[in-house]
Amino acid sequence: MIDSDISAIMSGIIRTSEQNHHPQSQEYRHMNPSQMGAEELPNDLQSLSWLTSVDVPRLQQMTNTRMDYSHTSQNPLMQQSGHLSNNVHSPGSMIHVPTSMQQGILGLSTLTSHGSNMSQYSMAGHVSPSLQAQQPVYQTHSQQIYGLSQGSQCSSANLYNSSYRAQAQFTQPHLAAHPTQELQPKSYPKPIYSYSCLIAMALKNSKTGSLPVSEIYSFMKDHFLYFKTAPDGWKNSVRHNLSLNKCFEKVENRLSGSSRKGCLWALNPAKIDKMEEEMQKWKRKDLPAIRRSMANPDELDKLIMDRPENCKAPSKLVESEVQAMTTIGNLPGRIPQHQPHRVMTLSLQSIPLHHQIQTQARIASGSPAPAQSPPIHSVPDMTHSPLQQHIMSRAASDFLSLTSDMNTEVDALDPSIMDFALQGNIWEAMKDESFSLDTLGAFSSSPLQLSDCDLGTIGLTPVSSSGDHSFSDFQVTSLYTTYPTLENVAPSQCVPGSGTKPIALL
């Protein structure tokens, strides 16, 4: 008897649910199959599994009060809650939404109306006691929307937090990845220079010309940022180049107490020019690639050409010292400050130019003057200065060759600037004794050192002599001049007692 009543009640419930809550089969035929999901198909047979654990008195109450909670199609939001709870024994956990309602699932009105149903259910799927007394308002069949009281509706913010929480966990890290990509440092290519050239740059730009291996690493990482992120294998290459390349030599670190640790590396002075030539070759080969690999491309020329003092080549060092010596020699302090007598000048404008070109400059070995006739005024000697002694000790041959070249250039000067200073009253004495330079014969080849007489520094009018005779030999040795025996000259034109007596020029 009881079984027959239960069967009658169940069949009535099924017929009522089919009539009120499911569209006819013709509606599914007219729908686009691509818009229908698995949850939108008729699922009456799938929802019959709860009949084995149903409460008969509660079903009777639901039938009498027209409660439809067990036959609506499942809401996607409640389906997520059902999967999380894994408990479908209660009829309240299986809430279905009709197919006609699938167009408004994502709408706020549908979500807010069914959000109250979700808030009334626990995660285990049991019906809250407050729902048993509520009377939902049934609206038209075409919309299939269940409206509840205004107080039981939930806000859209709560629905967003509950339904889209899983999706937000994936979208937020995706959006946060863009700033990190923009903040990534700029990648620098590997420099085209060889490791030996990079090591040479580091040593050339050091203060002392020698560095430990760790500071060579730091130099390369500071100026070529590729090595900051490169694998540590490049450090082994640097050590191999230091050990095997003859351009580098190990220097003992005197400041270090242990001989094994803290050794320094320096450039071989004989290989500096070769390394600079190698750097310039790579620079001419691909300058844009080198600039792209550098942290500061404007420092390229400085890194290639700069040298510490102890890394300068010997030839360049001597040349710089000779230039410094020449500068010191041209200072105003070198001019004699005391002029006790009036100085006259003797011009050699009457000397033919071809005779002057034939004369060659030589360094005088000594003065032909006797010991009892010292010079009236002496020129300061620079050979005793410390700088001159240092230069002569290191590069005597280069300095002498440079001096000889200067004397050769002096021979080709205009004769109008080759004035010799005569001191005292010698010129008046020669005029009183009717001394004439025209009577002099030829010049003898003798060196002339212009450093002994300051030419052009005193504004005196040169005195030139006139005559038709040319001088073939005129010997000037240091501070003295001598006149040899005259040939083809009348005795009356000679100065009595002149002979080979030296005449002081200063």
UniProtKB/Swiss-Prot annotation:
Pfam families: Forkhead. InterPro entries: Fork_head_dom (IPR001766), FOXN1_4 (IPR049624), TF_fork_head_CS_2 (IPR030456), WH-like_DNA-bd_sf (IPR036388), WH_DNA-bd_sf (IPR036390). Residues 190-286 bind DNA. One of its GO terms (molecular function) is DNA-binding transcription factor activity, RNA polymerase II-specific. The keyword Transcription regulation applies. Its main location: nucleus. The keyword DNA-binding applies. SUPFAM superfamilies: Winged helix' DNA-binding domain. CDD domains: FH_FOXN4 (cd20057). One of its GO terms (cellular component) is nucleus. GO terms for biological process: amacrine cell differentiation; atrioventricular canal development; heart looping; positive regulation of transcription by RNA polymerase II; regulation of DNA-templated transcription; regulation of heart contraction; regulation of transcription by RNA polymerase II; retina layer formation. Coiled coil: none annotated. This is Forkhead box protein N4. It comes from Xenopus laevis. The gene is foxn4.
